[in-house]
């Protein structure tokens, strides 16, 4: 028992550290929060184990606050999944309400939302109804099984039918450009923020040139290769004062693409 209590405290401390650090850092990348996956999973499994193995007098009884939090959160997630395809199919009507130019352009990206994207939300809603029935009849094993099965199918469906289309809206144009340069001997750089997309999708081997990731060198020095830059439309001000020559070669869904022209 003491070992379990000590492990639980250690896991809780780790989760708190991750949450605090992730709240402080400015660059919000999912990899930074991945350390929270194990503590969250452990604590959830521990709570379910206690729920299923509770004493006969307490068996199947869920604290009112936990029950309310669980069903409210699940219902809100299901509602978002169900409403999202209708929202995304009609972005032309309200994209102008957003002040950020990148958000506007991203929402207006040509992505085919069919309506089937609501399926994860419907599965979650159905599972929520079944689980509510089992909670009322105090059947903890059935509650746990329904929860696990519902979340497995909901997550799998969301990753399959929703997330790829969200990716097309937010980063699709940039990824398409990077992939078009994968077979060209060139430099590609992202201006105005940190990104790994140019490194991954251009499929470039690690270069011998130590300046390959130096934006100042790529923008102002002689590179000897075609040099391309990608920047979000709401960050074009970062190019103000640039004394070199760049030619805009395209823009799409909130991204602007430039090629640097070197002086002879």
Where are these regions (language model features)?
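Membrane-embedded architecture of ER/inner-membrane glycosylation machinery
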Residues: 7-8, 12-264
């Amino acid at each position: 028992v003491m070992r379990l209590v000590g492990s639980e405290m250690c896991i809780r401390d780790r989760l708190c550290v991750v949450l605090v650090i992730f709240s402080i850092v400015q660059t919000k990348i999912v990899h930074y929060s991945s350390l929270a996956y194990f503590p969250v999973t452990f604590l959830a499994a521990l709570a379910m184990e206690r729920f299923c193995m509770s004493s006969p007098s307490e068996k199947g009884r869920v604290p009112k606050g936990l029950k309310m939090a669980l069903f409210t959160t699940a219902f809100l997630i299901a509602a978002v999944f169900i409403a999202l395809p209708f929202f995304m199919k009609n972005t032309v009507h309200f994209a102008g309400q957003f002040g950020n130019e990148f958000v506007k352009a991203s929402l207006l990206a040509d992505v085919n939302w069919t309506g089937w994207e609501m399926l994860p939300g419907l599965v979650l809603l159905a599972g929520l109804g079944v689980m509510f029935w089992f909670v009322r009849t105090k059947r903890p094993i059935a509650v746990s099984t329904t929860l696990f099965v519902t979340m497995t199918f909901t997550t799998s469906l969301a990753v399959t039918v929703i997330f790829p289309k969200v990716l097309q809206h937010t980063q699709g144009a940039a990824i398409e450009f990077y992939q078009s340069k994968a077979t060209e001997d060139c430099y590609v750089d992202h201006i105005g923020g940190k990104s790994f997309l140019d490194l991954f999708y251009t499929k470039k081997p690690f270069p011998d040139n130590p300046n390959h990731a130096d934006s100042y060198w790529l923008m102002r020095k002689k590179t000897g290769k075609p040099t391309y830059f990608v920047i979000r439309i709401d960050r074009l001000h970062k190019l103000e004062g640039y004394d070199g020559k760049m030619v805009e070669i395209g823009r799409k869904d909130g991204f602007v693409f430039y090629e640097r022209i070197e002086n002879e």
